[in-house]
Amino acid sequence: MLHIYDVVLEVIASLRGPLAQIERRDRDLGRQLRRASASVALNLGEGMYSRGQLRTARYHTALGSMRESTSCLEVARAFGYLGELDAELLAKLNHVTGTLVRLVDGPR
């Protein structure tokens, strides 16, 4: 199993508070964040046990969902639903995104 999968689960757990704040103000945006963040874990989990192009496709979808999750948080901040995000959460978001980019692009 990839170590990054555990980090993704930590990110999802860290989103409980911000997600609740967002959902109080904008249920649609909250739902979108919930679906996108779950999609990261689900596609990463599926990709870990896939092969070839299917593996790459799952990791690519996970990367897109990770960017969508981050964008949901950025939009929520822009609308004033959230204050500053926790530095540790931001670091984990960036770490997951970077790892997924490397998984999709492969070794250089």
Question: Which ranges hold each PLM region?
Answer:
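Amphipathic alpha-helical assembly/interaction segments
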Residues: M1-R108
